[in-house]
């Protein structure tokens, strides 16, 4: 049976009962040329543990884009980061739908069978998984709908195409049921500014005294709290349409709900009364143990004491029952203190941020480092500068070629950070998710035209909540400590929410205890001018826009407080220039790149070995980038390459007129009115006389110029056959 639905700017075609018919629920979904299979399977036996055993796996098949997997093994193997992050998005969106007490192992598999470059795979995959789950015999009463919102040319766009998203200032992904929001992912997308800004570049046509760095600016496109609410409101309306459309279309095709048993809520009023009467202060003392391991140890001791009491033995209370009731009692104390007393377990008010300490460049041989400590959460964040060859190469189904990512963020969470002796493993979904959030928060502040590849690593040394946001703060300062001129500092804070009846409280800078016993985890990161990234997960059925707005504005207060402390730390940074890589960026005639490479790469290999440098070449633009540990060797390699191109130019008949024209008749102070022959990233070339040009560096340009304009200039310097100009 086939069903076609037009909703939220796209036509979705569903095939029901056509494939995977032995699954509990399955659907084949098509949007344009994208085809996705979503299947749900459930075991008949419950697990003994008290948790929801749900597994979500999003899988991309390379044949979906007409490709054969690369590498030695010609088949799909370990999931990539995009697959893992998409699996996490689907899991976080669907997990709240399952009824309380549901303990049957359940698997949701989403396979991309055909990929259209213009179709958003994350939106399609979540909606396909949602419909498959809704059609199954699992007791899920309403389908989730996921939408993406862009902001293009000042207007919000629902479900933009992939090419449209590249021109968007906003990437907002929201999932919900009807008018209830369940999950939010957001990032701002930077773009180049149109106006001319001061840039210092390295180029053989420039005055060498100006070759001090390579700086560009772009618009970070942070979003204000009000604009963010407008975007989320629009997404909520689209979710309502989508959720209603799915329910109406598939209500009559939903399987009969299976006759399942649910784990009963363990309740024993007598145990709770006994704990409240004799152990209330002990539980409060345990709550005040901020470390997770210490708190768990204290609660375990209390449970053992109660189990050994005469009352417990007489009433038949075993330790498992007591521990369960004790956990609920602890949660009640935490939440009651927040709602009624406006006080938290560590004595803070609802809006208070924990004490913060910041140290920078504590690692002498690292390019940049920051030890950021907030309460009992501590992140050591380290930045390393590399070249284009160090960029992370990734393949995406929707991209024809591999994508080079020059900004990488890795998040590591060892067990000792929470006092646990757990084995060190490869990063899991949580680590990838936290690292991705920190990367999204910091990315808009990174120069898009930076000649460096940047790798930021966050080592969590202590954790009691908000470790990902500590990584954002530490990462922003770590970049500055490595000499990276980010546009603005970026800070992050984790917000919480507690609902009790008609009352609620929004918490700033939540601890692990408040994350566990609260109703919301809402991470907000941004600069002094707005939000660059946020992530929200709701444990309730949903959240209203009014409460969300309150949380956003409360987060802004905390962010401003943290940024003020970060500004002070930034002013005290001493960059360790000795360990930073030295870099030269210059241009040659693109046709001479082949001479630099040499036959079978012989010449460039000799240069790399002789001068101990790394070299990146852009064949199309003629750009040469040399990086190394010693400036003398980098400069020597640059001179050597220029000699190669000059040698080839003279012997082969090529002549760079701008470089070899006779400049002897020119003197410093000579004044000219010349035509702008060429605009470059680093300045304007002005025609003087006799075919000779001079360079007006961009740092001396005070108003926009264009080729063909006439401008008055005077000679400021003559070096190496090149003329530098000032405005006259």
UniProtKB/Swiss-Prot annotation:
EC number: 2.7.7.8
Record domain KH: where: 581-641
Acetylation keyword on record: no
CDD domains: KH-I_PNPase, RNase_PH_PNPase_2
Entry keyword set: Cytoplasm, Magnesium, Metal-binding, Nucleotidyltransferase, RNA-binding, Transferase
GO term, biological process aspect, one: RNA processing
Signal peptide from the UniProt entry: none
GO MF annotations in UniProt: 3'-5'-RNA exonuclease activity; magnesium ion binding; polyribonucleotide nucleotidyltransferase activity; RNA binding
Cellular component terms (Gene Ontology): cytosol
Entries under NCBIfam families matching the protein: PRK11824.1 (NF008805)
Protein name (record): Polyribonucleotide nucleotidyltransferase
Gene (name only): pnp
